[in-house]
């Protein structure tokens, strides 16, 4: 795993885990990753997550399936280290006519586009999930 973009590595790990029907995936821990996974759990895209403290902290993410098919159809990284994507409160993205979510890092924490719209906040677009 390349550590140039740890968020993209986590997203790829989740995507690959669901393609291979894994029960859980393990990724290195960071607070930003934990906040992203909290949003995924709150929106019902994953079952649960746990923080494991072995030699170094890791996130154990339990993936969710419905009728043998993964709940997350597509998860895509938007803002990257080489090209940051920001939006203000008027230009927040709408993913799949509000059937999906955009995860946004704001000054008040990581949240979905819907919650950011309600609070009148903009920020960095981390990823799209549908």
UniProtKB/Swiss-Prot annotation:
Coiled coil (residue ranges): none
GO cellular component: ribonucleoprotein complex; ribosome
Cystines in this chain: none
UniProt cross-references to InterPro entries, sorted A to Z: Ribosomal_uS8, Ribosomal_uS8_CS, Ribosomal_uS8_sf
SUPFAM superfamilies, per the entry: Ribosomal protein S8 (SSF56047)
Sorted UniProt keywords: Ribonucleoprotein, Ribosomal protein, RNA-binding, rRNA-binding
GO molecular function, one term: structural constituent of ribosome
Pfam families linked: Ribosomal_S8
Gene3D superfamilies: 3.30.1370.30, 3.30.1490.10
Swiss-Prot/TrEMBL GO biological process terms: translation
Matching HAMAP family: Ribosomal_uS8_B
Role this protein plays: One of the primary rRNA binding proteins, it binds directly to 16S rRNA central domain where it helps coordinate assembly of the platform of the 30S subunit.
Subunit structure: Part of the 30S ribosomal subunit. Contacts proteins S5 and S12.
Similarity section: Belongs to the universal ribosomal protein uS8 family.
Identification of the protein by name: Small ribosomal subunit protein uS8
């Amino acid at each position: 795993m390349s550590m140039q973009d740890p968020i993209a590595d986590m997203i790829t790990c989740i995507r690959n885990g669901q393609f291979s029907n894994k029960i859980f995936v393990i990724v290195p821990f960071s607070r930003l990753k934990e906040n992203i996974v909290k949003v995924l759990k709150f929106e019902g895209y994953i079952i649960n997550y746990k923080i494991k403290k072995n030699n170094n902290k890791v996130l154990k993410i339990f993936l969710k399936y419905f009728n043998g098919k993964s709940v997350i159809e597509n998860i895509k990284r938007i803002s990257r280290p080489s090209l940051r994507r920001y939006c203000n409160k008027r230009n927040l993205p709408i993913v799949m006519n509000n059937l999906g979510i955009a995860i946004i890092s704001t000054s008040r924490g990581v949240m979905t586009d819907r919650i950011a719209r309600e609070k009148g906040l903009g920020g960095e677009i981390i990823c799209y999930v549908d």
